[in-house]
Each structure stands twice: as structure tokens, then as C-alpha cells.
Amino acid sequence: MATLLLEDGTIESNLDEIVRELAPLGIYLKHYDPGTSILFPHLLTQDALTDKEKCHIVDLHNSVFEFIQQENGYLWCDLLNVHPGSPNLQTLIATYAQYHTHTAPEALYVLAGEMIFGFVKPDGSQVQLLVQSQDYLHIPSGVEHWCSLTASLNFKAVRYFTAADGWVPNYTGTRLNDSLNK
């Protein structure tokens, strides 16, 4: 389940409260239990996956969660699989660890692992959201955010796209608030 860290150090783990905190940004967060991870647990524990295994995971996931694509107008999806041996891991981390926006929404369903997303709220305050297995996150276009892997460096998620070119980051130059940089 997701948790939210506020600037004052408060940690919120109640999903309804997290959703309320993120509502001014238009962010949608939902936890689906059980998730599709029960359909392919052996593949979720592997670091490296073949293209065939990735397609198998996405196909099984879509057989259960096809409504996510239909309800939100997503055109396509893929599997993001990051692990300590991923090629260009440090480049990937550096690319998304800076505050940025996208012209298209960013949406994903977490299959395994965890990731941290930082957001700038309308009042300028910042929050950090930890998403975990079975969490679905939709970030509207234009929302200022960053994301980072946790120390495990393991993360698998189905990513959803509304544009052919995916999520192209537009960097904003906003700095991470020191109270959240722990």
C-alpha cells in the first residue's frame, strides 16, 4: 500500500487521506487487491526478463485490467522492468530524479517493487509518495513531479501511454525541499 510523506515529516498511510492530499493535483491513486501479480509470481522475482516474458506479463495483466486502458483512453502500454543489472540504470535514475512535467499523463500499475514520486502542490509545498505492488497511479499532464527507485533498485510496472512518444520529461528546475531530502 502507498504511503505519503508530508513536508512537516508526517507519514500518512491511510489511502483515503493520501487521495485527499493529492486531490488538488488531480492525481488518481487506487490499490487493487488482489492484483495480477498472483498470475505470474515466478516472473516477478526474476531480474532480467525476455521480450516474450514481458509480453506474457502485459497480456495477463490486461486480461484483468483492460478497463484501465478503456476508461482512461490509453493507446498502448508496456512493462517497465528495472533491476540492479539494468543497462543504463544510472542514466535512467538521473533522468527522472529531477522535477519535470509531461505533456501527456503518466500512469502505471505497480506489479513488484516500489518507487518514490515527489510532487509540488499548488501552494508550493512538496510531498513524496511511495507506491508499491498493486498500486495504480495516474498523474495528469502538467503536474510537476520526479520519481526515483528505492534502495532495492527493483521495480516492475505496466506503464500506460496516451501519446506515441511516451512520457517526454520537460525539466522545471525546481529543487527538492531539504525537509524531504532524507
Curated annotation (Swiss-Prot):
Its EC number is 1.13.11.54, 1.13.11.53. The keyword NAD does not apply. One of its GO terms (molecular function) is acireductone dioxygenase (Ni2+-requiring) activity. It catalyses: 1,2-dihydroxy-5-(methylsulfanyl)pent-1-en-3-one + O2 = 3-(methylsulfanyl)propanoate + CO + formate + 2 H(+); 1,2-dihydroxy-5-(methylsulfanyl)pent-1-en-3-one + O2 = 4-methylsulfanyl-2-oxobutanoate + formate + 2 H(+). Pathway: Amino-acid biosynthesis; L-methionine biosynthesis via salvage pathway; L-methionine from S-methyl-5-thio-alpha-D-ribose 1-phosphate: step 5/6. It comes from the Bacteria. It is an enzyme of class 1 (oxidoreductase). One of its GO terms (biological process) is L-methionine salvage from methylthioadenosine. The keyword Iron applies. Catalyzes 2 different reactions between oxygen and the acireductone 1,2-dihydroxy-3-keto-5-methylthiopentene (DHK-MTPene) depending upon the metal bound in the active site. Fe-containing acireductone dioxygenase (Fe-ARD) produces formate and 2-keto-4-methylthiobutyrate (KMTB), the alpha-ketoacid precursor of methionine in the methionine recycle pathway. Ni-containing acireductone dioxygenase (Ni-ARD) produces methylthiopropionate, carbon monoxide and formate, and does not lie on the methionine recycle pathway. This is Acireductone dioxygenase. It comes from Nostoc sp. (strain PCC 7120 / SAG 25.82 / UTEX 2576).
